[in-house]
Amino acid sequence: MSLVYMNIMTAFMVSLAGLLMYRSHLMSSLLCLEGMMLSLFVLATLTILNSHFTLASMMPIILLVFAACEAALGLSLLVMVSNTYGTDYVQNLNLLQC
């Protein structure tokens, strides 16, 4: 395994650890999710470029589309929660409440 792949996997693990440790604020959770998606995008792109597998060349672009949709939904949820409650705490998100 090359050093580049190990660095990308380390970036993914650090983002995952940040998501698990700093989950009190919604903004920090969204930033960790974006870091995970970025490392997955770079890993998928490098893997496809190194293996010359041209049939899967659309997969990183599709992953980028999903990451953009996730970011838009996360930011709209952040705006809604901060306007409603005044803070961006994750504990304010109660899905059982009507």
Swiss-Prot record:
UniProt KW keywords: Electron transport, Membrane, Mitochondrion, Mitochondrion inner membrane, NAD, Respiratory chain, Translocase, Transmembrane, Transmembrane helix, Transport, Ubiquinone
GO molecular function terms here? NADH dehydrogenase (ubiquinone) activity
What Gene Ontology biological process does one annotation of this record name?
A: ATP synthesis coupled electron transport
InterPro entries this protein is in? NADH_UbQ_OxRdtase_chain4L/K, NUOK/Mnh_C1-like
Q: Which residues cross the membrane?
A: 1-21, 29-49, 61-81
Glycoprotein listed as a keyword:
no
Asked if Thylakoid is a keyword of the record, the answer is: no
Q: Which reaction does it catalyse?
A: a ubiquinone + NADH + 5 H(+)(in) = a ubiquinol + NAD(+) + 4 H(+)(out)
**Where in the cell is the protein located?**
Mitochondrion inner membrane
Q: Which GO terms describe its cellular component?
A: mitochondrial inner membrane; respiratory chain complex I
What kind of membrane protein is this, topologically?
Multi-pass membrane protein
Q: What is its EC number?
A: 7.1.1.2
Family in the record: Belongs to the complex I subunit 4L family.
Assembly and interaction partners: Core subunit of respiratory chain NADH dehydrogenase (Complex I) which is composed of 45 different subunits.
Question: Could you tell me what this protein does?
Answer: Core subunit of the mitochondrial membrane respiratory chain NADH dehydrogenase (Complex I) which catalyzes electron transfer from NADH through the respiratory chain, using ubiquinone as an electron acceptor. Part of the enzyme membrane arm which is embedded in the lipid bilayer and involved in proton translocation.
Write the protein's name: NADH-ubiquinone oxidoreductase chain 4L
Species whose genome carries this gene: Muntiacus gongshanensis (Gongshan muntjac)
Lineage, please? Answer: Eukaryota, Metazoa, Chordata, Craniata, Vertebrata
